[in-house]
Swiss-Prot record:
GO terms for cellular component: eukaryotic 43S preinitiation complex; eukaryotic 48S preinitiation complex; eukaryotic translation initiation factor 3 complex. Residues 17-170 form the MPN domain. Component of the eukaryotic translation initiation factor 3 (eIF-3) complex. GO terms for molecular function: metallopeptidase activity; translation initiation factor activity. Component of the eukaryotic translation initiation factor 3 (eIF-3) complex, which is involved in protein synthesis of a specialized repertoire of mRNAs and, together with other initiation factors, stimulates binding of mRNA and methionyl-tRNAi to the 40S ribosome. The eIF-3 complex specifically targets and initiates translation of a subset of mRNAs involved in cell proliferation. Belongs to the eIF-3 subunit H family. One of its GO terms (biological process) is formation of cytoplasmic translation initiation complex. PANTHER family: EUKARYOTIC TRANSLATION INITIATION FACTOR 3 -RELATED (PTHR10410). This is Eukaryotic translation initiation factor 3 subunit H. Residues 280-291 have a biased composition (Basic and acidic residues). Residues 280-300 are annotated as: Disordered. It comes from Brugia malayi (Filarial nematode worm). Keywords: Cytoplasm, Initiation factor, Protein biosynthesis. Signal peptide: none annotated.
């Protein structure tokens, strides 16, 4: 969890996010270059960078005017001192960030940090590291956001950039470090309202607006002729999405089992404490009747309550639920956009479906044969 112990600076006034087209192009270029180079598999972390801009108080708008990528961690080799290398990497990363902000200031570019961006396939960005980074930003900058870029949808022709921030209740609970089931229930916090999604508006220059208007006037024929050789590649991405969804369901099932065990242990603990309190109360009444001093309840109050065995309390189950919802939303959208249910089964599960129908036919044939043999024996 985040180690920040400061209080929230104040409620955010931002209601939507405005992104310059320059920022969009830099994010897309950065992510595509690293994904084609295979750096995600080597470094084992998301492609990310920092956002700079300003807050328009009158319009209640967060303007993101520029961005720059952050340095990646180099892979550890055998025999290296991990702690020393991590400290050196963090110092180098901090120095590069300050140097870039200094250059922005010298060039009269907005250099105020307003958040960060990350690239996550299918928009499944809900991880502990992302939450910790949001806590760090929003504890000092209440209007800070994270932009989540989906490279899979973008390659299929749909630019996907979404802006998130922690809700006020989620930020307060994160700063307190208390994600127990009782605290989340009292705060009314669920995986649906843990993060707030802000509307995103992309600001283009006048020349770009003119070009888009001309493209709109040309009609669909020219676009269809120029894109007839393109392929959406939905089949492969949907297969990866379903595999990730299966992993999310397994993780979610594990957290649900841990919560179920916690509920049973908590009920058993409450019953034990209640019985002990009632027994001590009756014993004290008898002692008072005999003129003896009553016994203390401190030993009963010191009984250790059960703890949720997940890593970060209810936060882990919230993250698993959000990831599963992101993957299921993408799968549902892809199926509705490109496939009927029958073609979806034929495209992705043709071998398994064929084996299933074959096994069913074999079972039916054996069943009918056994039934016929039994009837013949009766005759």
């Amino acid at each position: 969890m985040s180690t920040i112990s400061a209080t929230v600076a104040g409620p955010s006034i931002v209601q939507f996010v405005q992104i310059d087209s320059l920022v969009v192009m830099k994010i897309v270029k950065h992510v595509d270059s690293e994904m084609y180079a295979g750096l995600n598999e080597v470094a084992g972390e998301a492609c990310q960078g920092l956002l700079t801009g300003l807050v328009s108080i009158d319009d209640r708008r967060l303007e993101i005017t520029n961005c720059f990528p952050t340095a990646r961690a180099e892979p550890m080799l055998d025999g290296d001192e991990i702690a020393q290398n991590n400290a050196f990497y963090e110092e180098q990363k901090q120095a590069e960030m300050l140097d870039m902000l200094r250059k922005f200031r010298d060039m009269n570019i907005d250099y105020e940090l307003v958040g960060f961006y990350q690239a996550h396939p299918f928009g499944a960005c809900f991880a502990q590291e992302t939450i910790d980074s949001l806590i760090d930003y929003q504890a000092s900058v209440p209007d800070g956001v994270v932009l989540i870029y989906d490279p899979v949808k973008t390659r299929q022709g749909q630019l996907s950039i979404r802006a998130y921030r922690l809700s006020t209740k989620a930020l307060e609970m994160s700063l307190d470090g208390d994600w127990s089931p009782e605290s989340t229930r009292t705060a009314g916090l669920t995986y649906e309202n843990m993060l707030e999604e802000l509307p995103v508006v992309i600001k283009n220059s006048h020349l770009v607006n003119v070009m888009l208007a001309e493209l709109a006037l040309e009609g669909d024929c020219a676009i269809q002729r120029s894109s007839s050789h393109l392929e959406l590649g939905t089949r492969r991405s949907l297969e990866k999405c379903l595999r990730s969804l299966m992993s999310d369901v397994d993780d979610l099932n594990r957290t649900v089992m841990a919560y179920t065990k916690y509920v049973a242990d908590k009920q058993r603990y409450d019953l034990t404490v209640y019985n002990a309190m009632q027994k001590r109360q009756a014993e004290n009444e008898q002692r008072e009747a005999r003129g003896e001093p009553p016994l203390s309840f401190d030993d009963i109050k010191k009984m250790k309550p059960p703890q949720l065995t997940t890593k970060c309390g209810m936060l882990e189950s919230f993250l698993c639920s959000s990831d599963a919802r992101a993957h299921s939303d993408y799968a549902a959208e892809a199926c509705l956009r490109h496939f009927s249910f029958s073609s979806f089964c034929l495209c992705f599960f043709n071998e398994n479906i064929a084996k299933l129908f074959l096994a069913e036919a074999v079972v039916d044939s054996h069943g009918s044969r056994d039934h016929g043999g039994a009837a013949a024996s009766v005759r």
